[in-house]
Amino acid sequence: MIGYDRLGTNGRFGNQLFQYAALRGIAAHHGYEWCIPPDDHHTYANYGIHHPFKLKHLKHEGFVNANNSPQAMFSYENIQQLNSTPNVRESGHNFDQELFDNFEDGSNLDGFCQTEKYFKHIENEIREDFEFKDDILQPCKEFIDQYEKIIFLHVRRGDNVGREDYHPIVSFDYYDRARKYFDDDVNILVCTDDPEWCAEQSYFDDDRFLLNTDVPKYDHLCLEGDGTHKHSCVPYTDLCLMSLCQGAILAPSTLG
């Protein structure tokens, strides 16, 4: 059995998708059983992979490391001190062939694993796991079906604010240049982790832009890039809507 014990703590929702898929890909490559933390696991980054997806192939929920706690899950260094369980982190941000080929049963995966090379060989199974539950998918389809032409425009702020040196926030000039690739009459759905900020920007006053400011938020606070703590937006509906649109204007992010 292998797992990803810090799933939901080591990065936000987009990171969790890659981490889950990489865990599954490594397990399939070696013929291992695999597990992920249960739905009610308390984390520091809004654990949510159970909520929107069917996860058809999930069989085991739990942890590879014993005696875990939210404090132990907070960092890779902390989790290494729990016990003798091997905790294995990728060597860099590129595909780690050595990790992929030599991952031992009974180990715990860590890192961001942001490349499809970890799970390309089981792509269809990953797509099946990430099918949206009907209570999320159907309202989104009904909304999108109202429009003959609709694309989404992604505004990523959140924990990037205050860390622009290495997580740049794109300018309105970028969005202007990107919009030139689409018809003038296309509707533009604004998908963002900061709808309140977007609502204050005159850029989005045009009727072509569709912006929902009544977005559900997580109950607990999450640390932002500027050092403040906020209730961050639940991203499931936006992700589902984006998957149904006919085109995209992306901002730099894991989901982008």
PLM region descriptions:
Residues 1-8, 33-37, 107-111, 148-162, ...:
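Short hydrophobic beta-strand segments
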Residues 1-7, 135-140, 221:
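Short amphipathic alpha-helical segments and their helix-coil junctions
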Residues 43-185:
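Secretory-pathway luminal glycosyltransferase catalytic domains
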Residues 13, 183-256:
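Donor-binding and catalytic core of enzymes assembling or modifying cell-surface/extracellular glycoconjugates
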Residues 10-11, 39-44, 114-115, 156-160, ...:
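Short, solvent-exposed loop/turn segments at secondary-structure junctions
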Residues 15-18, 22, 171-174, 255:
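Conserved alpha-helical elements of sugar-nucleotide-dependent glycosyltransferases
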Residues 22-26, 174-181, 241:
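Amphipathic alpha-helical segments that form well-ordered structural scaffolds
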Residues 1-46:
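N-terminal pre-catalytic "stem/leader" segment of glycosyltransferase-like enzymes
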